Amino acid sequence: MKNLENLLAEIESKISQQSVLNKSVSEASVGWHVEHILLVINGIISRLKRSNPAEFKGAFKMSRFIVFTTGIIPRGRAKSPESVVPKPFDTESLIAHIAIAKERIKQLDEMNPNFFMEHPFFGHLKKEDTIKFLRIHTNHHLKIINDILK
């Protein structure tokens, strides 16, 4: 699977097609998926930075095991949390969110490996698993975008 920087470059290349919609694939436009990906990346990395490693609670979650083993998030199974549902956006805001994501992704290298974030379905994910989730999630939405554009 591609690293986050390569995935972000692919996302950036889709901005010019943000208004494309194919309801047989998704109720949302290409731009909605791009903005959603960026909200997730930016929000999760921000939460990761603010975490307290002493509060980490590891627990086995079957859903995490399946998604992390297969690298696939099934389509249409989960509803996005309100915090990552795109509000109105335009080309400038997408470009600004790409720039923020690039900076935050660079910050991952210096972060404590014990920093974590809490995922609504997968529980607490330490930095390494958080990065893996971001790659899987981004790839999931890029596949949808590419299907919309077919």
Question: Where do the protein language model's features map onto the residues?
Answer:
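Charge-rich, low-complexity N-terminal segments
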Residues: 3-30
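A short small-residue
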Residues: 18, 77-85, 117-121
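Short, helix-capping/interhelical loops that line the mouth of catalytic, cofactor-
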Residues: 2, 46-96
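Short, contiguous alpha-helical
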Residues: 20-69, 113-150
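Substrate/cofactor-recognition hotspot
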Residues: 108
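Amphipathic, non-membrane alpha-helical segments in soluble helical-bundle scaffolds
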Residues: 1-5, 27-34, 87-95, 128-131
